[in-house]
Amino acid sequence: MDKKQLVRLAQDGSQAAFEELVTKYQSKVFSMAMSFIRNREAADDAAQEVFLKAYLALPKFHLRSEFGTWLYRIAINHIKDVLRKRGRAREVSLDDVRELSIVDENALEKADAERETEARKGLVLSCVQRLPEKYRVILTLRDIQGLPYDEISQVLHMSPGTVDSRLHRARRMLRTKLASHLGQEGGSHEM
């Protein structure tokens, strides 16, 4: 069954059809929330609230655009609200800390490599979070969520040219922030 059929069934009150739509989009919505909110529990709550808002607004959805595009628009607006309510306080989860059960040379090397990878990811996410919102949103949708330009254009209600130029600026700003941060640490890191 295609997405349009699922949407129509959900609009007609089919709980199973809506649950299937949730299943199809749950990981993408959660991932989007997580990339902005950076706290697993808060991102999970936000994702659930996005689906609740979508469910309540479903009768107003007219299938003129893709369901995913409509849902991402709801998600972006809700995530902005969550961040405004939190006062943009950044939360960093320490769930990445793992204990080694067997201490040997290979395990230590692997743990060091994982920590380095996590540190790099954390640095990139931290720099992304410091970008102005209009650039952070586009960078997240394209480079983290992997949405195509035309879908980003629809979600954000802007021309593909504007999406392209803002994405270019966002990437340049991110490179500058990363270079500045790495320069402060001695510049010996490779990204």
Where are these regions (language model features)?
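Internal acidic/polar
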Residues: 3, 89-114, 148
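DNA-recognition helix of helix-turn-helix
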Residues: 76, 80, 135, 144, ...
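Sigma70-family region 2
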Residues: 11-12, 38-39, 51-66, 85-86
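N-terminal module of bacterial RNA polymerase sigma factors
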Residues: 1-28, 35, 129, 151, ...
